[in-house]
Amino acid sequence: MKFTSVIALVATAATLVGAVPFETNAERLARGLPPLPPARRASGVEAAKPKPSPSHGCSTGPVQCCNDLVDRSNHTVGILIGLLGIVLGPVTGLFGLGCSPLLGGGAKCQSQTVCCSDNKFSGIINIGCSPINIGL
C-alpha cells in the first residue's frame, strides 16, 4: 500500500513538473526577478576547433577542388604556362584549373577532387594532379 502511494505521488509530481510552462527572461524581469543564466549548448573551445579533413592519402598538400582537370595538350594550359612564365620539365599527371583547397570536415566539392604535386599558382593552375575520390 505504501509503495503504491509513493509511486502515485512520484507520478503526480512528475506530471506537474512537466506541465509547468517555460518562463522567459522577459516574464521574469517583468515580475522583478533576475534573468536566468544562458543555456550552454556547446563549449566555445570545442566549436572553435578546426575539423580535420578526412583521410585521403594526399601527401603533397591539401586536397584541391578544381573546376577543370585537363592534360598538357589543352590550349588553355599552354596559354597559362606562357603567361605565368612556368618552365615545365616532365610532368606526371594532369593540370587542375581554377582550384581551391578543401578545408574542414564538412567541405564539399562540386567539381573534381584532386591531389596535385605543385600548388604554387594560387589555384589558377595546379600541376601534376591526380583525381581522387574522398567520398564527399
UniProtKB/Swiss-Prot annotation:
Q: Does the keyword ATP-binding apply?
A: no
Q: What's the stated role of this polypeptide?
A: Aerial growth, conidiation, and dispersal of filamentous fungi in the environment rely upon a capability of their secreting small amphipathic proteins called hydrophobins (HPBs) with low sequence identity. Class I can self-assemble into an outermost layer of rodlet bundles on aerial cell surfaces, conferring cellular hydrophobicity that supports fungal growth, development and dispersal; whereas Class II form highly ordered films at water-air interfaces through intermolecular interactions but contribute nothing to the rodlet structure.
The protein's name is: Class I hydrophobin 16
Q: What happens when the gene is disrupted?
A: Increases the sensitivity to sodium dodecyl sulfate (SDS, a cell membrane degrader), hydrogen peroxide (H(2)O(2), an oxidative stressor), calcofluor white (CFW, a chitin synthesis inhibitor) and micafungin (MF, a beta-glucan synthesis inhibitor). Leads to sparser aerial and reduces the cell wall thickness by 40%. Does not affect the chitin and glucan amounts, nor the cell wall synthesis-related gene expression levels. Also, does not affect the hydrophobicity of the aerial mycelia.
Q: Which GO terms describe its molecular function?
A: structural constituent of cell wall
Share what the entry says about its subunit structure, partners included.
Answer: Self-assembles to form functional amyloid fibrils called rodlets. Self-assembly into fibrillar rodlets occurs spontaneously at hydrophobic:hydrophilic interfaces and the rodlets further associate laterally to form amphipathic monolayers.
- Where is the protein situated, by its record's location annotation? Secreted; Secreted, Cell wall
| Cystine pairings recorded for this chain | C58-C115, C65-C109, C66-C99, C116-C129
Protein species of origin: Pleurotus ostreatus (strain PC15)
The residues the entry assigns to the signal sequence are 1-19
Q: Which UniProt keywords apply?
A: Cell wall, Disulfide bond, Glycoprotein, Secreted, Signal
Write out the similarity annotation. Answer: Belongs to the fungal hydrophobin family.
CDD domains for the chain: hydrophobin_I
Which residues are glycosylated according to the annotation? N74
Q: Name one GO cellular component term.
A: membrane
